[in-house]
Amino acid sequence: MIDRYKHQQLRIGLVSPQQISAWATKKIPNGEIVGEVTKPYTFHYKTNKPEKDGLFCERIFGPIKSGICACGNYRVIGDEKGDPKFCEQCGVEFVDSRIRRYQMGYIKLTCPVTHVWYLKRLPSYIANLLDKPLKELEGLVYCDVCFDRNPNFSFARPITKKPTFLRLRGSFEYEIQSWKYSIPLFFTTQGFEIFRNREISTGAGAIREQLADLDLRIIIENSLVEWKQLGEEGPTGNEWEDRKIVRRKDFLVRRMELAKHFIRTNIEPEWMVLCLLPVLPPELRPIIQIEGGKLMSSDINELYRRVIYRNNTLTDLLTTSRSTPGELVMCQEKLVQEAVDTLLDNGIRGQPMRDGHNKVYKSFSDVIEGKEGRFRETLLGKRVDYSGRSVIVVGPSLSLHRCGLPREIAIELFQTFVIRGLIRQHLASNIGVAKSQIREKKPIVWEILQEVMQGHPVLLNRAPTLHRLGIQSFQPILVEGRTICLHPLVCKGFNADFDGDQMAVHVPLSLEAQAEARLLMFSHMNLLSPAIGDPISVPTQDMLIGLYVLTSGTRRGICANRYNPCNRKNYQNERIYETNYKYMKEPFFCNSYDAIGAYRQKRINLDSPLWLRWQLDQRVIASKEVPIEVHYESFGNYHEIYAHYLIVRSVKKETLYIYIRTTVGHISLYREIEEAIQGFSQACSYDT
């Protein structure tokens, strides 16, 4: 188990066999050391209990039920009495069953096995360190070298620290005709294993010996010297040779970086060859009973069984059968290597292994990699509880710190809080009754949901979260539909728009998370870019288009509209198709409320010109501007008509009224700006 307070990061790397043994072995109170899995069995078909020393053994991995051993005896966990802490009959400790989630086991391999990730994955780290072709190493690991009758194919290189057969210093071939008949005799004697390990050391054992003999610092020095020599030679004039030199220099750089990484992390190269194979905790590879009494098992269990079967067969060949032919032993070693390869990465050597239904087994690599792997699904980008996801749409009537949640999402996110509210108000006797009321969507449910949401912020996140403004908190309100409503000014921080983007909703549960959401993450508290300090809540995209449409009324003045032949034709068309209002007569309004009311009643359009009474104390006339027309009334009052405004004067030339020529769109924008300025002024007055 990982303690989140002690461990702030996770690193995957190579470990030594001693470390694997320390993780997987444990000493039970009677002094016995357990941890090795030796049998390929899971559960007994009659008793339905885990087999001893099998893949689900309770002695190795802990009890299935807390405080109950394999015999059925029960002990209180943590009891300080003198009772033994384990069962003397079955050897199972009386501990919590959650130990089966992290207690590992191990398989002691009869022959060394290379880790397929470091051999077959590109680039091959083993081939890089040994400076040998990958094909040659594969032939050595999978025992294809010793039995290929091709005269041009060579044996593996002998280990230099051992006395070798006929003092071999390099690869040797079937150069002498008599060797074809004399050498195979050595592989049929009883001392085959001793001869092989002493003389030619094939298989993964040869790789392990060569990796153990490496001096990483010498590799770095020699690679650097060779790299400098290749750089000093310069171009040869032959394009093919120049490409080979460039590839060689790149290889030397990668080799030096790899050797430095091994030195920096205190990892020995021979750890890339496995002698002990870790066995995952049983709760991470479960066997589940489904309807009808059938069992459903993880694919990893079957792959582990195959490894144990082949490993036990190899052990029997080397121990019980003294006269086993060498070819059979090496073939069995190859089967063990392939079984471990399939367990770690199925299909990396060609066709993947399939079950009886022609379904590919999911190996350890398939479990942890990809979008549905352990890391991305359950650790990094996992779908957590109390979260939802939906498409975002614009909410023009929302405040900057609010967001609209659909009822369907809100009732799921806050269901536990609603259940608690129903029970506290004695509207439901238990959880079951409360859930039934929620399913029936009774009116009281929505009332309690509204109360809960008023005091609980939510977090909105849009992937990819590239900076801290990619996740912000909002005060949720209920909306109809199935989409999340969002204020358009916060889109720039999320790098979002309303063309189908989706956002995730999270509910902060702990008090610390709620405090952080309220004090630091609210959208109206993040108005500046954390990178450069510029305002980030500025109109973009849809808002700019909306402002343009809102203020797109004609600005050419009354002269252009009245005396332009094109406009006269347009006015005639509008007068024909519009019966509610004659466009040739522009209406007069006393205030902005009357103008907006006429627009809502569809008496005028958004861009229709109109006359709005203006305040007398605000100057609108330029000093050198003269009226275009002057209309006189019978009582002596007269109207001075300018391009964008109109003044009503009395007989004594006193200004009675001032009208400005505008549109409903301009009026709406002006009112919004006026309200914003008034709110800012009030906020400043409160601060002072």
UniProtKB/Swiss-Prot annotation:
Superkingdom as given in the UniProt entry: Eukaryota
One GO CC term, this protein: DNA-directed RNA polymerase complex
SMART domains for the chain: RPOLA_N (SM00663)
Cofactor descriptive note: Binds 1 Mg(2+) ion per subunit. Binds 1 Zn(2+) ion per subunit.
MF annotations from Gene Ontology: DNA binding; DNA-directed RNA polymerase activity; magnesium ion binding; zinc ion binding
EC number(s) recorded for this UniProt protein: 2.7.7.6
Binding site for Zn(2+): 69, 71, 87, 90
SUPFAM superfamilies: beta and beta-prime subunits of DNA dependent RNA-polymerase
Keywords from the named record: Chloroplast, DNA-directed RNA polymerase, Magnesium, Metal-binding, Nucleotidyltransferase, Plastid, Transcription, Transferase, Zinc
Signal peptide as annotated in the record: none
Record keyword Phosphoprotein present: no
Biological processes per GO annotation: DNA-templated transcription
Complex formation: In plastids the minimal PEP RNA polymerase catalytic core is composed of four subunits: alpha, beta, beta', and beta''. When a (nuclear-encoded) sigma factor is associated with the core the holoenzyme is formed, which can initiate transcription.
Family per record: Belongs to the RNA polymerase beta' chain family. RpoC1 subfamily.
HAMAP family with a match to the protein in the record: RNApol_bact_RpoC1
Protein name: DNA-directed RNA polymerase subunit beta'
